[in-house]
């Protein structure tokens, strides 16, 4: 059915959940059908609780990167999180980032998740800390969104925080979740400075 997602938008959630749970890739035909239906979904109003539950279920899994990359490839991620969609193909204006903003944010999640399976001695402590985090989905969401403010070409942290306010309302996040996300967004550049100028083993 070529219009199946327009008839029932929530089937999109089922497709990506199933693909993640069974470690499957989307077929080219399914990608085509999803893309074809996107214009019909742009004005659809997702329920906050359903959108939050869907995104957090994906973020709670160990392979969030793969499924978010697949969602981004067919522009579903930008449909659900327009703030992220704005930074697609956006180039960083510095010497430190090799990839576009969208790819950088997704790869940040990949690097974090790789710590779970880490076997390198020098990363053992970081791996242990990561596995002790009680709400990894919040940390991953902050990574996904941390540079989205660069889409406007202004102060990306200030813009990112404005974007984040909209996302917090749209997802209906709890006060503690919102506070943590804002803290991570506001101070993420400090992590960059620390990584470049400090001995992380000290």
Where are these regions (language model features)?
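Non-catalytic interface/linker regions that flank or bridge core catalytic/transmembrane domains
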Residues: 1-95
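Structural motif corresponding to the C-terminal cap of alpha-helices
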Residues: 1, 23, 116-120, 147-152
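Conserved phosphate/pyrophosphate-binding and hydrolysis machinery centered on Walker-type P-loop NTPases
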Residues: 5, 44-48, 61, 98-105, ...
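Active-site-adjacent "gating/activation" loops or surface patches in catalytic cores
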Residues: 73-89, 93, 99-143
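Divalent metal-dependent catalytic cores for phosphoryl transfer on phosphate-bearing substrates
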Residues: 100-101, 127-202
């Amino acid at each position: 059915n070529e219009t199946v997602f327009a008839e029932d938008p929530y089937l999109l959630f089922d497709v990506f959940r199933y693909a993640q749970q069974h470690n499957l890739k989307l077929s080219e035909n399914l990608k085509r059908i999803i893309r074809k239906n996107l214009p019909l979904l742009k004005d659809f109003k997702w329920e906050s609780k359903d959108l939050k539950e869907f995104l957090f279920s994906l973020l709670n899994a160990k392979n969030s990167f793969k499924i978010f990359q697949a969602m981004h490839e067919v522009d579903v991620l930008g449909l659900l999180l327009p703030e992220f969609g704005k930074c697609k193909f956006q180039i960083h204006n510095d010497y430190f980032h090799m990839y576009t903003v969208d790819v950088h944010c997704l790869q940040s999640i990949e690097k974090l998740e790789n710590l779970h399976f880490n076997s390198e001695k020098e990363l053992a402590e970081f791996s242990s800390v990561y596995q002790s985090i009680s709400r990894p989905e919040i940390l991953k969401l902050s990574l996904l969104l941390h540079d989205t403010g660069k889409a406007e070409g202004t102060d990306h942290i200030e813009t990112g925080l404005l974007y984040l306010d909209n996302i917090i309302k749209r997802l209906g996040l709890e006060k503690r979740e919102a506070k943590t996300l804002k803290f991570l967004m506001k101070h993420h550049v400090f992590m960059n400075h620390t990584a470049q100028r400090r001995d992380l083993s000290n």
